[in-house]
Amino acid sequence: MAGVLRLAGAARSPLARALAPAARRMGASAAAAMEDEAYWTEWEEEEEKARARESAPVAEMCPTGGGGGGPQWVVMGRPGPQKHAHAARLAEVLAVPYISMGTLVRQELSPASSLYKKIANSVNEGKLVPEDIIFGLLTKRLEEGYNKGETGFILDGIPRTHMQAEILDEIVDIDLVLNFKCADNCFMKRRFGGDICPHCGQLFDFSKTASSDRNPSLGSCTWPSQVQHAAVLGLEDSRMEKMRAYAEQTKLLEDYYRKQRKLMELKTSARPGETWQGLVAALHLQHLDASPTPHKLTM
């Protein structure tokens, strides 16, 4: 495994050194969206974590890997409690810390924090949290872990864009990126409804053959969710535009890690236990579970 941090001479201002090249490229207006936490409640998170634990017996699990370093992995995909729960569970199994970017930001939403006003103002004004704050918090957390002897991590909530991925590569060596992909259009059906392409957020009109057979933005056939039309549900154009932008950013991010041969895609299921078994199989950790269930996984 790669070293924990690319921070030579960590004792002397490693945070400033690590962020210096990134800051030059970010620009004054660059910002990161920490919106994954807005789609689900803490109660849902705890419920999903409990289900994930039930599907993965602790007694049969032990840390994997050897040598002086642990896995340095990123999880990405549609926001939702199942992704967070399985990422946290995987970190527990591998005996590495689970680092949630959303949690790091929330911890600074305290009047005692020097960043409180900056973050609170961004949130209250509906703006994005500046990337210098995001990567500052992340680098600080990684340095603290390094100083405590941590040798790996599961990172959730960042990167969200191609540029963030490049900045992250300047700070740490990422070994693997687990991409949780919601099967059967479950994200769109659950959150929005409507005849929506799960890849780009495009609305479909089933009265027109072309729209249901081929998505021009992808150049491939699609099978959108056949539920109520989006217009009936009163979906706002701004919401759909956000989903299209999210899809575009995600595709660029996937391509970035695919070119590095670090991307592993996992089709998630409505049943947390099935998703966990698929994750175990994808990572060749079948010995951690007595009855793994095979799933279609691509590397």
From Swiss-Prot:
UniProt-listed InterPro entries: Adenylat/UMP-CMP_kin (IPR000850), Adenylat_kinase_CS (IPR033690), P-loop_NTPase (IPR027417)
EC number(s) on file: 2.7.4.3
Q: Which family does it belong to?
A: Belongs to the adenylate kinase family.
Residues binding AMP, per UniProt: R106, K127, L128, V129, G157, I158, P159, R160, Q164
**UniProt KW ATP-binding keyword:** yes
| Record's subcellular location | Mitochondrion
Instruction: Specify the protein name.
Output: Probable adenylate kinase 7, mitochondrial
